[in-house]
Amino acid sequence: MSDVIKKFLKLEAASGIILIMAAMLAMILANSGLAGSYQAFLDTQVQVRIAALDINKPLLLWINDGFMAVFFLLVGLEVKREMLEGALSSRVQATFPAIAAVGGMLAPALIYAFFNYSDEVARAGWAIPAATDIAFALGVMALLGKRVPVSLKVFLLALAIMDDLGVIIIIALFYTQQLSLTALAIGILATLTLLWMNRRGEDRISLYMLVGLVLWVAVLKSGVHATLAGVIVGFMIPLSGKRYASPLKQLEHALHPWSAYLILPLFAFANAGVSLEGIGLSALLSPVPLGIMLGLFIGKPLGVFTISWLAVKLGIAQLPNGVNFKQIFAVSILCGIGFTMSMFIASLAFEHGGLDYGSYSRLGILVGSTLAAIVGYLALRIALPNREADQSTEGL
């Protein structure tokens, strides 16, 4: 496994602890005497005005539209690198996690739709349980240390990247608002400029960021979700260059700490604060949170494992080296940790759906993701060989 992937796995696993702390802090504040201050902080208006450009949004939307665009820029860089030289660079390597990712998105979406098909507003949340939070999933896996085979970590990483790619497509197709043709035209022009820069071998990251900023503003104003600008810029950064060995890897390395230790924890803090006041068992079992909980905890492992098993049995794909189906099943449960990615989709799905839909969806995400983390950890602990014990025995 390359040094880049090793560093990535180590960093993302460590950030999971900070994510948990950020989410817990948000929950504590939302259910304490500081709830009003917490909400007021998120509602703080932040205005940026440059000549005719005027962007005035609450802090919450700056986090969701701005900071998360940087996160999706990183996702774009990761997907491109893996497709060119990593775990997704060959058909044999990519087939198994790709098929698993498709199953892991379809089954949760169908389960959610089953419980919410009659509610027009709730139906918009069908993609919420389809996402996987790679930081949390790798963080849980890291608790088992060297017992986890490298090939199993790479499988989870590749699956999560495919999952992210699916989320990007879903956002583009299903969560786009009424379009502004003028802003969209500027966005297309900025994209073509980035493509031209890539084709002519431009490798100065600063120029890509400058055009990328124009693209982000245009996409923000167009009605398409602004995070897609980050993905586009990520795909346009060249893997190799004349001045720099790899502009893509250089930018990826620079963004990882900011994403792991600031952007995702800040997003978790801003979106995980669910007030539990007046929420009882009946609320927890209402269609929206129930569909999300079952989608994450039941649908994810059902979809990932079943379609993976069928693909191997039918000869369409093959298991990674040194990995068995028990371990794949355990990892498929960990894929039900939706958390930040699920909350991001929920913020888009219920942006205009009312307070209850937003709160109930976050509640379902928290419960479903927690169950997936606990059960997934226990299942993986049972499925993995006790390598450390074996090594200590050999030394006697």
Swiss-Prot record:
<dbReference type="GO" id="GO:0005886">
    <property type="term" value="C:plasma membrane"/>
</dbReference>
<feature type="transmembrane region" description="Helical">
    <location>
        <begin position="254"/>
        <end position="274"/>
    </location>
</feature>
<feature type="transmembrane region" description="Helical">
    <location>
        <begin position="328"/>
        <end position="348"/>
    </location>
</feature>
<keyword id="KW-0472">Membrane</keyword>
<keyword id="KW-0813">Transport</keyword>
<feature type="transmembrane region" description="Helical">
    <location>
        <begin position="95"/>
        <end position="115"/>
    </location>
</feature>
<keyword id="KW-0406">Ion transport</keyword>
<keyword id="KW-0915">Sodium</keyword>
<keyword id="KW-0739">Sodium transport</keyword>
<dbReference type="InterPro" id="IPR004670">
    <property type="entry name" value="NhaA"/>
</dbReference>
<keyword id="KW-0997">Cell inner membrane</keyword>
<comment type="similarity">
    <text>Belongs to the NhaA Na(+)/H(+) (TC 2.A.33) antiporter family.</text>
</comment>
<feature type="transmembrane region" description="Helical">
    <location>
        <begin position="363"/>
        <end position="383"/>
    </location>
</feature>
<dbReference type="Pfam" id="PF06965">
    <property type="entry name" value="Na_H_antiport_1"/>
</dbReference>
<keyword id="KW-1003">Cell membrane</keyword>
<feature type="transmembrane region" description="Helical">
    <location>
        <begin position="178"/>
        <end position="198"/>
    </location>
</feature>
<dbReference type="InterPro" id="IPR023171">
    <property type="entry name" value="Na/H_antiporter_dom_sf"/>
</dbReference>
<feature type="transmembrane region" description="Helical">
    <location>
        <begin position="124"/>
        <end position="144"/>
    </location>
</feature>
<dbReference type="GO" id="GO:0015385">
    <property type="term" value="F:sodium:proton antiporter activity"/>
</dbReference>
<keyword id="KW-0812">Transmembrane</keyword>
<feature type="transmembrane region" description="Helical">
    <location>
        <begin position="278"/>
        <end position="298"/>
    </location>
</feature>
<keyword id="KW-0050">Antiport</keyword>
<feature type="transmembrane region" description="Helical">
    <location>
        <begin position="154"/>
        <end position="174"/>
    </location>
</feature>
<feature type="transmembrane region" description="Helical">
    <location>
        <begin position="213"/>
        <end position="233"/>
    </location>
</feature>
<feature type="transmembrane region" description="Helical">
    <location>
        <begin position="59"/>
        <end position="79"/>
    </location>
</feature>
<feature type="transmembrane region" description="Helical">
    <location>
        <begin position="16"/>
        <end position="36"/>
    </location>
</feature>
<protein>
    <recommendedName>
        <fullName>Na(+)/H(+) antiporter NhaA</fullName>
    </recommendedName>
</protein>
<dbReference type="GO" id="GO:0006885">
    <property type="term" value="P:regulation of pH"/>
</dbReference>
<keyword id="KW-1133">Transmembrane helix</keyword>
<comment type="function">
    <text>Na(+)/H(+) antiporter that extrudes sodium in exchange for external protons.</text>
</comment>
